Amino acid sequence: MPNWETSTAAPSYEQHNAWYSSMFAANIKQEPLSHHHHHHGQQHHDNHSNSNSGASSPRQSPLPSPIPPSTQLEQYLKQQQQQQQQQQQPMDTLCAAAMTPSPSNNDQNSLQHFDATLQQQLLQQQQYQQHFQAAQHQQQQHHHLALGGFNPLTPPGLPNPMQHYYGGNMRPSPQPTPTAAPTAVAAAIQTGDKLQALTPPMDVTPPKSPAKSQQSSAEPEKEHDLMSNSSEDMKYMAESEDDDSNIRMPIYNSHGKMKNYKCKTCGVVAITKVDFWAHTRTHMKPDKILQCAKCPFVTEFKHHLEYHIRKHKNQKPFQCDKCSYTCVNKSMLNSHRKSHSSVYQYRCADCDYATKYCHSFKLHLRKYGHKPGMVLDEDGTPNPSLVIDVYGTRRGPKSKSFSGSGSSCSSTSKRSNASAAAAQQQQQPVATSQLSAALQGFPMPAAAAGTAAGAAGTAAPAAVAPVSPPSPAKSVASVEQAPSLPSALLPPLASLLQQNRNMAFFPYWNLNLQVLAAQQQAAVLAQLSPRMRDQLQQQQQQQHQQQQQQQQQQQQQQQQLPAHSENEEDEEEEEHEDDFERKSVDSAMDLSQGTPVKEEPQQQQQQQQLPHSNHMAINLKLKDEDTPLISSSSASRRKGRVLKLDTLLQLKSAAMSSPEQQLKLPASVLPTASSPIAGSSANKQLADDPCSGASSADESMETGRVPQVNISASSTASSSGNSSNASSSTSNPTAAATVATSGTVSSSSSSSTTTSSSAPAIYECKYCDIYFKDAVLYTIHMGYHSCDDVFKCNMCGEKCDGPVGLFVHMARNAHS
């Protein structure tokens, strides 16, 4: 500071102002702006000396003249050029990165201006670089996430992620002496130049703090996923070890969703297991509380505590036989085994939802208000005795109570037609929605008739054939072809299932299975010998030709009928077409007409003793009481009139045809599923014994005792989706035949001896050539035959070598 007391005033104000301006320009603009930190003391000293000199001797030296503006501008431009040259030098760049001022380039001995502060900053930067490289090297060895150095964003008080690297190595750097400044600073500059490329700039954000280990977080998530479909026995346990971190902190699954623990008594939701256990204790009686000795777990059930203690001890005695999965109880193992199965036991009746777990199925039904479909067993067979209690607390499906089965059978026989039709119409939506569950356990009752077509290419068109009313020509053609057909490839399982009315198998034969049925028939035909396939193809061609011939003959005969017959025919055909269309729309499944029935002995004797057409026409006339009492629609009550007209047409055509055709005509008049004779006999049988399941279709399986009888069972799948069974029996061993109505899915069979009514039923497995006297044993045996390969076990999927290999496999291996 100048001494204002000793200094004298300027000669004039203008001279003093000019002197002050020149002094300000000389002292400020000649010094770099970035160097004011380190040269502040020097500038202050210079200003002080200049002030003192100017103040002490104003008279000895005259005041400097004002510097022209042009001279000041030139000096300012020169200083700017010097600053640009200084920034290009590595020395200045290193100092700028370390946030230290660059020395002035005007002096040649600029290194002398570096003091101990600059040297200390350079050494600290080198040490930071060494620690950074060491951290990266250790990170690569332990396979951790990318760890960074010091994070300036870390709040104070929190542990530094790099503290274990800096804690032991951070020492106060020695202060270099000013005497060794040239040598030490030169070495530091060379080292800084080499490390400049690897040193991160100070304005770049360091790496973030290390995240939590993925391995530690993945284990509880995996355990939580495994417990998602387990039973209620493990509802209090979700992790392998109930340590403090798992029971006192919220748990997140792999999708980032926090797990909640909901009380089933009051609905309170907790986010930690400790809070959930504390709340659960309030609902328990004090004398029944069981508490774990290692954690706050509480329960009222002894087996729950036992499972929990096994988790603490890491004891998992139950192990899967197909993988390395282990668990603490049998319920968890049963839930896990479903993951290895391809059978979806629970299906929705209102949508395509299917699942393996009953709990998930109940949640779906509650959420959308849907109705459950048919429950399947573990092997895929439909089990109508199991029902789903949607809003109940019972685990798994429950069985129906059969206490009132006798009264229900007696009431069924007395039910009126309207009530029966209404009951079946209510069951139709459930029946039509069952998709692809039928063929998981039972093979389809297909046959080697014309619908099989010998190959997949010809079977598929037959499966989608248009619906057409039954005509006499087609019936005659099928009857003529029946004696030459080979025996059935698959047993008539439909008639077997109809014996037990509790096995609601027919709802599965609907439009959804048409393509699958054609593929199943093609797969069966592919296993036959080439000679058998050629024979079937030839028979199909012959049948097609005969059908065309019969249609031509039918057209010629209709033109020769009298006028009154034509009028009656038109009226009856219109009624039949209306009824047939109404049935195809209203009734997707007619089970009442599919019951196999027995012919009365009197009717059999009349058909044998009356060869003439007039007597046969008289015996086939209908009465009012011959119509079926149980039907699904009004169409089946008028089927008798149509049959009478068809019978008259067949008899007239037989009178004009050759004697060979006359011999074949009586077989075509046999009662079928749509005939009133079959319906009347079915009603009589139901009235006599409504709860019995015996039928002539079961007795028609006696192919082993009567080898000379040809049995044909044809199955066709059409777009109508109707399902019916047709069976006929006669005492003539050479005239046994079956008629499959076109446009329906039918399975028919015929018996062949006069003593068939008293003989027991015998069931034959065509694959293994074995006969069964019990329907249950036969059903169990057929459940082991797979759909795609008959000698592959349907339970476990193992392929066997022929029937012997399959039986050995069934005997040696346990199937659950």
From Swiss-Prot:
UniProt feature, compositional bias: Basic and acidic residues: 219-229
PTM annotation (Phosphothreonine): residues: 199
Entry GO MF terms: DNA-binding transcription factor activity; RNA polymerase II cis-regulatory region sequence-specific DNA binding; zinc ion binding
Biased composition (Low complexity): 49-60, 79-89, 129-139, 399-427, 536-560, 712-734
Region called Disordered, residue ranges: 33-92, 129-151, 165-185, 197-229, 387-427, 536-612, 679-734
GO biological process entries: regulation of transcription by RNA polymerase II; segmentation
Listed Acidic residues bias regions: 567-578
A family per Pfam: zf-C2H2
Function per UniProt: Gap class segmentation protein that controls development of head structures.
Protein name listed in UniProt: Protein hunchback
Gene name tied to this protein: hb
